[in-house]
Amino acid sequence: MLDNVLRIATRQSPLALWQAHYVKDKLMASHPGLVVELVPMVTRGDVILDTPLAKVGGKGLFVKELEVALLENRADIAVHSMKDVPVEFPQGLGLVTICEREDPRDAFVSNNYDSLDALPAGSIVGTSSLRRQCQLAERRPDLIIRSLRGNVGTRLSKLDNGEYDAIILAVAGLKRLGLESRIRAALPPEISLPAVGQGAVGIECRLDDTRTRELLAALNHHETALRVTAERAMNTRLEGGCQVPIGSYAELIDGEIWLRALVGAPDGSQIIRGERRGAPQNAEQMGISLAEELLNNGAREILAEVYNGDAPA
C-alpha cells in the first residue's frame, strides 16, 4: 500500500456509501495529500432480504465481509453504522474511532398519519427491528406489525405502494440521505428507546496498524465515544446483537452520563427497563451494572426465549 493511500471497506447501500464518503471527506480535510479510495462490497445481510433479520440469526450480518477485507489487507479501515457493529471483534481488529453522533431517535414515517397515536386500530406498521416492535406493541397493541426489509429507498417505496400505513426508520439515516421531509414525527426515547450506538458512525481497523490509527485519531468524537461505550458495555453483558429486542441510550447531561436501557418480549407483553446516572469515567461499569439489573429483573428469561434457550449467564 502506498503511504498516502487509505482504502475504506464499505457496504454498497446508499446510506453505507454516504457514511464512507463522510469519513473520506473528514480524513482528506484533516490530512491534505491523503488519497482515500472506497472498496465497496456486499454482506450477508444485504443478500438475505426475504427473511426477518431476527430469523436470519447470527451477529455481524452487515460487517463480516468488511472485516475479512481488513484481515486480508484488501482495505485499511471499515466504516460501519454503530448499531450494526457486534460486541466482539475478530482477533487483530478493533473499533478505534467513533464519529460525532447524528440524531439517534427513531422516525415515524407515514403518508396519511401525523403520529403513532393517530394511527387507527388495525393499521399496518413496518419495521425490521424487534426492539422497535416490542415498544410499538406495548404502546399500541391494536396495531399490526409486519417485517420490513431492504435499504431506506426500498422501505419507503413499500410504504408509498400502500403495503404499510406507516413505517419506523432511523432519523439519522433519513437526514443523511436528504429525506428529512419524510419524517412525520421523531419518536422520543420515552416512546422508542434507540438501538445501541444508533446515529453514530464507527471505524474499525487492524489494531497493529499504527499509521492508520494515527490518521483516524482526528475523527474521534469524545462525547459520542463515551456515550456509545456505556451503551455497548450494557449490550456486551447482555450478549446482544443488532437483531434482539434491546434498547440503550446514553446522554451526557451536566457532566454526568444518563444511561437508559430496556429488554422486551417481541410481542410487547413484557418490557424490563432500567437506568443509571454516573461519572463519564465509569461509563463501562455503568453499562455492565445496568445489564446485571435487567437480567435479574426478568431480562434473562426474555432473552433465553429470543436466543432459543441460550440465555446470558
Curated annotation (Swiss-Prot):
Entries under PROSITE patterns matching the protein: PORPHOBILINOGEN_DEAM
Stored InterPro entries: HemC (IPR000860), Porphobilin_deaminase_cofac_BS (IPR022419), Porphobilin_deaminase_N (IPR022417), Porphobilinogen_deaminase_C (IPR022418), Porphobilinogen_deaminase_C_sf (IPR036803)
Disulphide linkage map: none
Keyword Membrane in annotation: no
Pathway noted in the entry: Porphyrin-containing compound metabolism; protoporphyrin-IX biosynthesis; coproporphyrinogen-III from 5-aminolevulinate: step 2/4
Gene Ontology cellular-component annotations: cytoplasm
Alphabetical UniProt keywords: Porphyrin biosynthesis, Transferase
Cofactor entry: dipyrromethane
Chemical reaction(s) catalysed: 4 porphobilinogen + H2O = hydroxymethylbilane + 4 NH4(+)
GO molecular function, one term: hydroxymethylbilane synthase activity
Subunit record text: Monomer.
Entry's family note: Belongs to the HMBS family.
Other facts noted in the record for this chain: The porphobilinogen subunits are added to the dipyrromethane group.
Protein role: Tetrapolymerization of the monopyrrole PBG into the hydroxymethylbilane pre-uroporphyrinogen in several discrete steps.
PANTHER family associated with the record: PORPHOBILINOGEN DEAMINASE
HAMAP family: Porphobil_deam
Protein name in UniProt: Porphobilinogen deaminase
Source organism of this protein record: Escherichia coli (strain 55989 / EAEC)
Name of encoding gene: hemC
